């Protein structure tokens, strides 16, 4: 069932250091090596909103996520292919990951219909009928030319009945087999996605059916879709602890600072989320002291930067008062600078975690970070995640 063939050498994953379940590694791709743990900014339409490729490189971005669903519908994958793929189309020269389009299609609710063949949905742009199947998803992703592509899966909503989740994960495995069968390019790594909701036995069933495909990496899917942290993190710990040690582990759609720290503790290597840019556009900045609301009254007269410890352009040049003024004046520079800062904050966060892991100091570092971030009220789910992180992986 292993159809990876020659790509295993191209996509080498080398662990550098371990500290409990947390680990640092190098993941080699055709467009260069990335170091993990890492956070991937989301460029839904082929751009990280408001941020240029040069700025992404300057703040430490290593791999960008692009969205198959949106790019398939507009401008169409063939136009992207005509540019030589996503790097030529976007002018970002580094590695890309494309999602399969499954999550966006599943989010359409009544506008889509799922069958064994795939998903039929209404194009949100013009109302036309569109069909997305495992074969079509791979075809589009090969045209987009990302380094890492995702298997087409069904992400059940939360809450969902257990029989539905089980039927869904069974279908996801069958779709994975079809993705494998039609994949043609050796310079793209196909990652499989483990589903099962918050049910450990269903997660185990998904793992047992998915692991034999021996893909170059594995994703933990179907989480951060509305369940509580208390439900989510036992599922993360259970799944990550049973994934291959020598393959990258990707927790999909997760990007809050506390989630990155807890996820890394449990052995996760890769994260993505729109959170840092979306929250920046709404006037919020991420810091080690929690989220700073620049819409509130206090920052309007504060002459310090967002974060004195941050080296992003906004923190090196602007005061909180100036950025708060720009927000009130509805100037586009404000959401741009806050998005830039928030992305740099998450990149700095994983950089600091890599340093701590390499120095065998991850748990003391995380204890200090969480005490400050949560202002002394560290939530139980976070503490429990770290308790699980000291247990041996199964």
Swiss-Prot record:
Known EC number: 2.4.2.29
Needed co-factor(s): Zn(2+)
Protein's name according to its UniProt entry: Queuine tRNA-ribosyltransferase
Reactions accelerated catalytically: 7-aminomethyl-7-carbaguanine + guanosine(34) in tRNA = 7-aminomethyl-7-carbaguanosine(34) in tRNA + guanine
Gene Ontology molecular-function annotations: metal ion binding; tRNA-guanosine(34) queuine transglycosylase activity
Functional description taken from the UniProt entry: Catalyzes the base-exchange of a guanine (G) residue with the queuine precursor 7-aminomethyl-7-deazaguanine (PreQ1) at position 34 (anticodon wobble position) in tRNAs with GU(N) anticodons (tRNA-Asp, -Asn, -His and -Tyr). Catalysis occurs through a double-displacement mechanism. The nucleophile active site attacks the C1' of nucleotide 34 to detach the guanine base from the RNA, forming a covalent enzyme-RNA intermediate. The proton acceptor active site deprotonates the incoming PreQ1, allowing a nucleophilic attack on the C1' of the ribose to form the product.
Pathway: tRNA modification; tRNA-queuosine biosynthesis
GO biological process, one term: tRNA wobble guanine modification
Family the UniProt entry places it in: Belongs to the queuine tRNA-ribosyltransferase family.
Annotated InterPro entries: ArchSynthase1/Queuine_TRR, TGT, TGT-like_sf, tRNA_ribo_trans-like
This protein's UniProt keywords: Glycosyltransferase, Metal-binding, Queuosine biosynthesis, Transferase, tRNA processing, Zinc
Gene3D superfamilies assigned: Queuine tRNA-ribosyltransferase-like
GO cellular component, one term: cytoplasm
Naturally occurring in which organism (per UniProt): Deinococcus radiodurans (strain ATCC 13939 / DSM 20539 / JCM 16871 / CCUG 27074 / LMG 4051 / NBRC 15346 / NCIMB 9279 / VKM B-1422 / R1)
Keyword Glycosyltransferase: yes
């Amino acid at each position: 069932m292993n159809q990876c063939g020659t790509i295993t050498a191209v996509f080498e994953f080398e662990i550098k250091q371990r500290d409990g379940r947390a680990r640092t590694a190098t993941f080699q791709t055709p467009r260069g090596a990335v170091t993990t743990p890492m956070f991937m900014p989301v460029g839904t339409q082929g751009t990280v909103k408001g941020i240029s490729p040069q700025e992404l490189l300057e703040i430490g971005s290593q791999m960008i996520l692009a969205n198959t669903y949106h790019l398939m519908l507009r401008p169409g994958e063939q136009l992207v292919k005509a540019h030589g793929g996503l790097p030529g189309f976007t002018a970002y020269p580094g590695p890309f990951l494309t999602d399969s389009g499954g999550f966006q299609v599943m989010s359409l609710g009544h506008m889509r219909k799922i069958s064994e063949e795939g998903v039929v949905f209404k194009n949100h742009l013009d109302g036309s009928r569109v069909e997305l199947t495992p074969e079509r998803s791979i075809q589009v992703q090969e045209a987009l030319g990302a380094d890492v592509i995702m298997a087409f899966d069904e992400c059940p909503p939360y809450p969902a009945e257990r029989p539905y989740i089980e039927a869904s994960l069974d279908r996801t495995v069958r779709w994975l087999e079809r993705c494998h069968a039609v994949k043609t390019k050796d310079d793209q790594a196909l990652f499989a996605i483990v589903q099962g909701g918050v049910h450990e036995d269903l997660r185990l069933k998904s793992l047992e059916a998915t692991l034999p495909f021996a893909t170059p990496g594995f994703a933990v899917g179907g989480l951060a879709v509305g369940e509580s942290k208390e439900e989510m993190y036992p599922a993360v710990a259970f799944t990550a602890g049973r994934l291959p040690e020598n393959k990258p582990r990707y927790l999909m759609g997760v990007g809050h600072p506390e989630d990155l720290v807890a996820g890394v503790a449990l052995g996760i290597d890769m994260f993505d989320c729109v959170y840092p840019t979306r929250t920046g556009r709404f006037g919020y900045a991420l810091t080690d002291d929690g989220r700073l609301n620049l819409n509130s009254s206090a920052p309007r007269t504060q002459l310090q930067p967002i974060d004195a410890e941050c080296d992003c352009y906004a923190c090196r040049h602007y005061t909180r008062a100036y950025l708060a003024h720009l927000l009130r004046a509805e100037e586009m520079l404000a959401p741009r600078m806050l998005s830039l800062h928030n992305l740099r904050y998450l990149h700095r966060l994983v950089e600091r975690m890599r340093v701590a892991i390499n120095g065998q100091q991850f748990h003391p570092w995380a204890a200090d970070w969480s005490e400050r971030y949560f202002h002394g009220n560290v939530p139980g789910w976070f503490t429990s995640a770290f308790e699980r992180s000291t247990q041996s992986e199964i």
